Each structure stands twice: as structure tokens, then as C-alpha cells.
Amino acid sequence: MLTAATELGYEGKIVCGLDAAPSFNTTYGGDCSNIYYINNINIDDPTTAEMAAAVEDKVSAVNKYFLGYDVVMIAKQCIEEAGLDDAAALLSAIENVKDFKGLTGTVTIDPETHMPDGMGMFMYTYDNQTPVMLEEFAG
């Protein structure tokens, strides 16, 4: 999208979702200063930064890795609580996840909507190719 916009002569700001988060900057290879994007992780958090450093050479999109990691760890916790023999008990465990401390934040599932409640998002831009957090939005 940035390549197409540049080729068309567009020089303004571009607001994106997770697809513009790193590794977009290194894949694109050019100045990304006009890109603004949301991310589900705070790359400045020490725990997140440590885990990101451990996996950045193994995965293409660290932020999406964190989401997947949290989903798997929530599933693990629910299976440990409810087992695999009773589908209703497992469903109840998933629907009632509360205060799970994950890499993307503290996750609580709303049993009525099945959506996570209270997860923050972070707005970033780039200084050339370096991510810069602008603001955290509480969930």
C-alpha cells in the first residue's frame, strides 16, 4: 500500500492496522515516517521486549505472535481447569476467563459476547524505520 501510494504521488499520512506494525518497516525498507498504525503490544514493556527479542528472528510478525501465544496459553489454562471430556465445562472455562496475564495485557472474556474486555491498544508511527509509540488507549 505504501509503495502504491508513493508511486501515485501521495505524500500524506497513512493510517493502518496491524499489517503496518514491524516487520512492515524492515520489509518495506524505506522511510516509514508517514505511517501510523495500531498495535496490540507495548514494545517498550520489559517483559514484551524480552520475549520479542527471543522470537524476532523466528517469526515474521512479532505482534501477531503475541496474540497467538496468548490464545494458546488461555486454551491451555482452560483445558487444565476443565479437562477435555466435558465440552460444556470447557466452554464455561473459556467464557469465564478472568484476569489472564498475557503478553498482550490482562485478558478477561465477556461471557455474553465472547469478546475480550479491557485490552489496550497502542498507536505508533515510525521515525524513519524505528517504531515510536504515540499513545496508549485503554480497553
Model-derived features with residue positions:
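Extracytosolic ligand-binding ectodomains
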Residues: M1-G139
